[in-house]
């Protein structure tokens, strides 16, 4: 690995939004390599405290004086152009680089970059593959969009030429990367605040495919129609996977009492080996097939692939068991797209329970508006739906869409759905209405997980 694009290790690099999951990982990689690092964020968090302990200078709040000694400033797409630190950097002619550009340049220092893309499943698949790579002793550097117990966080710095990272399509960020193995898990309509439509999204993934060198690999879910329409763009080696078709397939699928799949891995109608998952749902069978394909393409041993897959029990906020209270189970999941919600509820339906309460917090006004019809059809596996207000994230409420409007449509469809504006009210409703053996599933990419924690910690 090398950091040629930075040139001088004595340079001071400042991260605006350093508390973010990806930005903090980049900062930690540089701290490990003895760079001088500072960063700012709006709030203190366990992530910023961890970086401080590792030697970073952390500022709470964005102020122009925070960047006075910086030689290079890295910022996220969420940072506004009138941010005082950005403004000061331009005044002082300090070099600015967005997160995706910085990560792409970092990837140039590695030979075997594995970039995992797709609308859904990136964090889980990256985490699952990380288990496989660690079992195979390839000593990878890992950058994942969640907290993974085996690496005690969201980043691991290795000494080899293997670099494993998520590749997000938002604002075409992944087109700044340099994949040797590029993975496409699925393509779905999302981020329609940036992309015009599904065809625009497919065009971005088509460009991603073209980034892979001829001696590299495209690993793709061959049963996804949107992927099928662009896979011909590949000039590299192609490995497809699926349940009923593809180079690598899952046969003889059985689910255990917690909805975790067991299956045979088949190539050319010949069984390679069997695996038993410890994460639930059909979607995780597909995620595991992607990880298996990458392992095979990287010449990892079958036993290491099996042990890696079977040692994976999930990441935080992905069908995470939060605890039990009075024999009522609480699980949290990051799902925030209708397809993800359907998959999560399908897995939850197979999980032992009497009544399934789905507590959902829509994530961003733009997504709720553009995918509204899909949101009205993805909760059918829930016995009861509880809706919190929309989590704004980077957006402002224009009054065009609301969680109440979604609730009205769900009730029109005959589903039992209740809207609340405060987490305390949701908690109290659950206390009054849940019974022995019920399952509470909190769903969303915002802070809805707090409801489950409030319930458990009564």
Curated annotation (Swiss-Prot):
Q: What class of enzyme is it?
A: ligase
GO CC entries? cytoplasm
Q: List the disulfide bonds.
A: none
Tell me where it mainly resides: cytoplasm
Q: In which pathway does it act?
A: Cell wall biogenesis; peptidoglycan biosynthesis
- Could you tell me what reaction this enzyme catalyses? UDP-N-acetyl-alpha-D-muramate + L-alanine + ATP = UDP-N-acetyl-alpha-D-muramoyl-L-alanine + ADP + phosphate + H(+)
- Give the subcellular location: Cytoplasm
User: What are its E.C. numbers?
Assistant: 6.3.2.8
Please name the GO terms of the biological process aspect recorded for this protein, alphabetically. Answer: cell division; cell wall organization; peptidoglycan biosynthetic process; regulation of cell shape
Name the UniProt key words of this record, in alphabetical order.
ATP-binding, Cell cycle, Cell division, Cell shape, Cell wall biogenesis/degradation, Cytoplasm, Ligase, Nucleotide-binding, Peptidoglycan synthesis
Q: Name one GO molecular function term.
A: UDP-N-acetylmuramate-L-alanine ligase activity
Residues given in the record as ATP binding sites = 118-124
Q: Which Gene3D superfamilies match?
A: Mur ligase, C-terminal domain (3.90.190.20), Mur-like, catalytic domain (3.40.1190.10), NAD(P)-binding Rossmann-like Domain (3.40.50.720)
Task: Give the matching NCBIfam families.
Answer: murC (TIGR01082)
Question: Which HAMAP family does the record match to this protein?
Answer: MurC
Q: To which protein family does this belong?
A: Belongs to the MurCDEF family.
User: What's this chain's function?
Assistant: Cell wall formation.
Designated name of the protein: UDP-N-acetylmuramate--L-alanine ligase
Q: Source species, please?
A: Clostridium botulinum (strain Hall / ATCC 3502 / NCTC 13319 / Type A)
């Amino acid at each position: 690995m090398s950091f040629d694009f930075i040139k001088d290790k004595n340079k001071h690099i400042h991260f605006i939004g350093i508390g973010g999951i990806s930005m903090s990982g980049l900062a930690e990689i540089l701290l490990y390599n003895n760079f001088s690092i500072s960063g700012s964020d709006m709030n203190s968090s366990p992530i910023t405290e961890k970086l401080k302990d590792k030697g970073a200078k952390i500022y709470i709040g964005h102020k122009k004086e925070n960047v006075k000694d910086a030689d290079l400033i890295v910022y996220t797409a969420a940072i506004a152009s009138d941010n005082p630190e950005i403004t000061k950097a331009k005044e002082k002619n300090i070099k600015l680089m967005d997160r995706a550009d910085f990560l792409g340049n970092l990837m140039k220092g590695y030979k075997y970059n594995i970039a995992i893309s797709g609308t859904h499943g990136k964090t889980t698949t990256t985490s699952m593959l990380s288990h496989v790579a660690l079992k195979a002793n390839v000593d990878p550097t890992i950058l994942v969009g969640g907290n993974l117990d085996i690496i005690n966080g969201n980043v691991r710095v290795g000494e080899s030429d293997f670099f494993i990272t998520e590749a997000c399509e938002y604002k075409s960020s992944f087109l700044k990367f340099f994949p040797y193995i590029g993975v496409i898990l699925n393509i779905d309509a999302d981020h329609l605040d940036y992309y015009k439509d599904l065809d625009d999204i497919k065009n971005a993934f088509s460009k991603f495919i073209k980034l892979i060198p001829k001696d590299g690999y495209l690993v793709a879910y061959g049963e996804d129609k949107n992927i099928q329409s662009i896979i011909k763009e590949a000039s590299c080696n192609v490995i497809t996977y699926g349940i009923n078709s593809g180079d690598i397939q899952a046969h003889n699928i059985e689910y255990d009492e917690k909805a975790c799949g067991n299956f045979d891995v088949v190539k050319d109608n010949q069984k390679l080996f069997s695996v038993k998952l410890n994460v639930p749902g059909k979607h995780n069978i597909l995620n595991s097939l992607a990880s298996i394909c990458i392992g095979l393409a990287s010449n990892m041993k079958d036993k290491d692939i099996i042990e890696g897959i079977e040692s994976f029990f999930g990441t935080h906020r992905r069908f995470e068991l939060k605890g039990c209270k009075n024999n009522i189970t609480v699980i949290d999941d990051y799902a925030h797209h209708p397809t993800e919600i359907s998959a999560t509820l399908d897995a939850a339906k197979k999980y032992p329970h009497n009544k399934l309460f789905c507590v959902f917090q829509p994530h961003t006004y733009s997504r709720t508006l553009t995918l509204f019809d899909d949101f009205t059809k993805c909760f059918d596996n829930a016995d009861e739906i509880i809706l919190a207000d929309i989590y704004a994230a980077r957006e402002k409420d224009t009054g065009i869409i609301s969680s109440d409007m979604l609730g009205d449509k769900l009730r029109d469809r005959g589903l039992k759905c209740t809207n609340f504006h405060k987490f305390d009210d949701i908690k109290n409703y659950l206390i009054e209405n849940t019974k022995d053996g019920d399952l509470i599933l909190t769903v969303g990419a915002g802070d809805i997980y707090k409801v489950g924690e409030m319930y458990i910690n009564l």
